[in-house]
Amino acid sequence: MPASHAVDDAVEISGLVKAYDGRRVVDGLDLRAARGRVTAVLGPNGAGKTTTVECCEGLRSPDGGTVRVLGLDPLTQAHDLRPRVGVMLQDGGLPTGVRALDMLEHVARMYARPREVDELVERLGLGSFARTTVRRLSGGQRQRLALAAAVVGRPELVFLDEPSAGMDPQSRRAVWDLVRELRDEGVAVVLTTHLMDEAEDLADHVAVVDRGRVIAEGSVRDLVADAEDRTLRLEVAGELDVDGLARALGPELQVRAAGAGSCTVVGTVGPTTVAAVTAWLAEHDTLAIRLTVGRRTLEDVFLDLTGRELR
């Protein structure tokens, strides 16, 4: 391992293996997350990303490989790590019988130099339900409270599992702003999410995990950068014969159904492609409600890498 990694990496995973009932859900995974950066870990359900993060949090014991968090073993040196790491679980992991503000103040008292609780209450809009018990909170409210609890101790590293799940747009923006602030303060953020726009907006580095391994990684720009590939998105009034459009455009372009009456065309999309699509629509007396051309998105790349079948 290069010497620079020892300084820059908050998380270092090498050859991680974890099996359940003889089946490897993590199969020789390598991953690094740098300090002062947001690392997004993406993958379909069952890809192994949650198990990987749980090994980093000391919640699971690896069957093989090494995991180092802030240079320490999360299993044998958990006592030293706990004050330095914040964890936000997707299910919250919060005691349900206490009031929201009481819980956050209790967590803050566990740390030597916590954030101001009042500041977090204001930033994340916790005041409206401060005196409500956790069991009565909505999913989005629980997520905001769990995030506050994860960052109140001023961690050097924070793990965020689906941080904006169930949130309205205003709450989600507040969460994103706080994540950016943490990064700017030098905190390492490891983010798992199914929201591609969240990863595109926040991540400095993206790792795509599938079948227990990292199958692609890099910045969002690196992953979507293909000078020739563009995506045409088409939505029509009524039914759309996706197979017929694909035959008309030829094998050089990929035409994919994207819901009722819509599709995407991926490849070397240019003016001739747009002309061919509009000519085909006119020939079939089909009205386009929306036709846009743009760069490939992270979601396009993710689906190309992991497939489109349900898991």
Annotated model-derived regions:
Residues P2-S4, V269-R311:
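C-terminal coupling/interaction segments
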Residues D8-V11, K18-D210, A216:
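ABC transporter nucleotide-binding domains
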Residues S14, E235, T292-G294:
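Solvent-exposed beta-strand sheet faces enriched in polar/charged residues
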Residues G64, T76, D80, D102, ...:
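An acidic, carboxylate-rich microenvironment
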Residues L72-L75, V214, E239, T268-T272, ...:
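Short, surface-exposed acidic/glycine-rich loop or hinge patches that mediate macromolecular interfaces
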Residues G86, A108, A112, A225-E228, ...:
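A generic structural signal for secondary-structure junctions
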Residues W176-T268:
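ABC transporter nucleotide-binding domain
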